[in-house]
């Protein structure tokens, strides 16, 4: 879509910064990500000046419900300090949710259908929970938990823990990518084979899966953070 209509402008921009653009420099999933970010920024720009504790609008009510839900989940998974990490949880949840839902719009495709996008989110979550784990416990205590509770078991536990932690980004990536890709393909197949009301059912299912996968990704990230910041280390 972008390359069909705005490739010339894209080439000009990449030329200004000294890059040598290819014939089609903008992949669809890149432009979809940028569009998702732009939509989120515009929504918050609209919401910010309209915030009111006395007369909240529908958009404010919606985001207050989302905030309350995220806060409750963070407190449940991490404890009383869970609210300290809400900024990251909220960012990852809202981005993945909007990235999933944009695929419902005709002519658009969800960027989470491309493995590199879920992988980017998973890598961000991986680095985040390790960083906050070090901040909460100190580098020495955080690394010590990889050895397990007994020094004699350290040669066995360290490889197991390392493999377990390295598998987490892969698990997050495959789960999000596979579910979104499969849902999109099922919707497209039925859209081509049947009347409109039948694909509408699958589009509703696609919306449900979009919310569910964003929630699961966020919930697993919360669990990883909870394990990383636990003071039993």
UniProtKB/Swiss-Prot annotation:
One GO BP: proton motive force-driven plasma membrane ATP synthesis
PROSITE patterns hit by this protein: ATPASE_A (PS00449)
Compartments (UniProt record): Cell inner membrane
GO cellular component, one term: plasma membrane
InterPro entries linked to this entry: ATP_syn_F0_a_bact/chloroplast (IPR045082), ATP_synth_F0_asu (IPR000568), ATP_synth_F0_asu_AS (IPR023011), F0_ATP_A_sf (IPR035908)
Keyword Cell cycle attributed: no
Keywords: ATP synthesis, Cell inner membrane, Cell membrane, CF(0), Hydrogen ion transport, Ion transport, Membrane, Transmembrane, Transmembrane helix, Transport
Mode of membrane association: Multi-pass membrane protein
Transmembrane spans: 27-47, 85-105, 114-134, 143-163, 189-209, 210-230
GO MF annotation list: proton-transporting ATP synthase activity, rotational mechanism
Domain of life: Bacteria
NCBIfam families: ATP_synt_6_or_A
Subunit structure: F-type ATPases have 2 components, CF(1) - the catalytic core - and CF(0) - the membrane proton channel. CF(1) has five subunits: alpha(3), beta(3), gamma(1), delta(1), epsilon(1). CF(0) has three main subunits: a(1), b(2) and c(9-12). The alpha and beta chains form an alternating ring which encloses part of the gamma chain. CF(1) is attached to CF(0) by a central stalk formed by the gamma and epsilon chains, while a peripheral stalk is formed by the delta and b chains.
Family of this protein: Belongs to the ATPase A chain family.
Annotated function: Key component of the proton channel; it plays a direct role in the translocation of protons across the membrane.
Protein name: ATP synthase subunit a
């Amino acid at each position: 879509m972008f390359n069909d209509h705005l490739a010339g402008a894209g080439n000009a921009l990449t030329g200004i910064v000294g890059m040598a653009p290819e014939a089609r420099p903008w992949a669809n999933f890149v432009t979809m990500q940028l569009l998702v970010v732009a939509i989120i920024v515009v929504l918050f720009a609209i919401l910010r000046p309209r915030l009111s504790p006395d007369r909240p609008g529908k958009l404010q009510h919606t985001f207050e419900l989302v905030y309350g839900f995220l806060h409750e989940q963070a407190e449940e998974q991490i404890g009383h300090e869970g609210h300290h990490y809400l900024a990251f949880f909220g960012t990852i949840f809202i981005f993945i949710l909007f990235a999933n839902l944009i695929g419902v719009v005709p002519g658009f495709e969800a960027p989470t259908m491309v493995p590199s996008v879920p992988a980017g989110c998973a890598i961000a979550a991986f680095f985040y929970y390790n960083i906050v784990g070090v901040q909460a416990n100190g580098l020495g205590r955080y690394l010590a938990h990889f050895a397990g509770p007994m020094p004699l078991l350290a040669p066995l536990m360290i490889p197991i823990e390392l493999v377990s932690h390295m598998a987490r980004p892969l698990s997050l990536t495959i789960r999000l990518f596979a579910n979104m890709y499969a849902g999109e393909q099922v919707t497209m197949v039925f859209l081509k084979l049947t009347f409109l009301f039948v694909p509408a059912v699958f589009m509703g299912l696609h919306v449900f899966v979009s919310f569910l996968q964003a929630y699961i990704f966020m919930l697993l990230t919360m669990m990883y953070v909870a394990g990383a910041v636990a003071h039993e280390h």
